[in-house]
Curated annotation (Swiss-Prot):
Keyword Cytoplasm assigned: no
Active site: D143
GO MF term list: tRNA (guanine(46)-N7)-methyltransferase activity
Taxonomy of the source species: Bacteria, Pseudomonadati, Pseudomonadota, Gammaproteobacteria, Alteromonadales
Organism: Shewanella putrefaciens (strain CN-32 / ATCC BAA-453)
Function summary: Catalyzes the formation of N(7)-methylguanine at position 46 (m7G46) in tRNA.
Gene: trmB
Taxonomic superkingdom: Bacteria
GO cellular component, one term: tRNA methyltransferase complex
InterPro entries: SAM-dependent_MTases_sf, tRNA_(Gua-N-7)_MeTrfase_Trmb, tRNA_methyltr_TrmB_bact
Protein name in the entry: tRNA (guanine-N(7)-)-methyltransferase
Length: 238
């Protein structure tokens, strides 16, 4: 378990350093995950460098690019890439078994429009992604840090909202989802106060799950048990 705190920014909102908003649980790789990393990383893996990516070179084309922070085991990200071959997808995940699982699923699905980082998302966003380059940023089911004294560790804070805004194109969307209602309220408070965004909800709250976000098995089970999931979508307007 690693030390966990929040990111820090200077007065201009530039990322300075981070103490992670996640707990590192590395876990053991299965044979299949290890094989997928070995075989698929040369084509789908992105090695971190503090230089902005040239997306047209990375994907070999000009297309809208979607970036997902913390894709877990990657099943929904692979499904999204398969369902939208006209878009480019980049996933960031710190847990190596998740990276291996994602690459394995992507190879089986035959997707060619997906690239993956095994690195800290804050560093990737600040240094490896050009400003104004993304059509959508996705943050699905981040750690809610339930205890009040841990709320400062939540990734959705004012400074993070500004970092995401800088990376989005005008008209690009920051899409969040959580199964913890209190965290959805926190997200809503942060995002409604964040300059340069417009809530895509007609009533200024949450939105129905959009078709582009697959329903996960965990989520479907939660629905059957009466558990809620809250989606928030904010468009960059300035």
């Amino acid at each position: 378990m690693s030390e966990v705190t929040t990111a820090e920014f200077n007065e201009e909102g530039k990322y300075l350093r981070k103490i992670r908003s996640f707990v590192l649980r590395e876990g053991r790789l299965t044979k299949g995950q290890a094989q997928a990393i070995e075989s698929q990383w040369p084509t789908m893996g992105l090695d971190y460098s503090p230089v902005p990516l040239n997306l047209s070179e990375v994907f070999g084309r000009e297309a809208d690019t979607v970036l997902e922070i913390g894709f877990g085991m990657g099943a929904s990200l692979v499904q999204m890439a398969k369902d939208a071959p006209e878009q480019n997808f980049i996933g960031i995940e710190v847990h190596k078994p998740g990276v291996g699982s994602c690459l394995s699923d992507a190879a089986i699905a035959g997707v060619t429009n997906l690239r993956v980082y095994h690195h800290d998302a804050m560093e990737v966003l600040e240094h490896a992604i050009a400003d104004g380059s993304l059509a959508r940023v996705q943050l699905f089911f981040p750690d809610p840090w339930h205890k009040k004294r841990h709320h400062k560790r939540r990734i959705v804070q004012a400074e993070f909202a500004e970092l995401v805004r800088r990376k989005l194109k005008i008209g690009g969307v920051f899409h969040m989802a959580t199964d913890w209602e209190e965290y959805s309220e926190h997200m809503l408070e942060v995002m409604n106060a964040a300059p340069g965004y417009k809530n895509q909800s007609a009533d200024g709250t949450v939105v129905p799950r959009p078709d582009h976000r697959p329903l996960t098995k965990f989520e479907a089970r939660g629905h059957r048990l009466g558990h809620g999931v809250w989606d928030l979508m904010f468009e960059r307007i300035a």
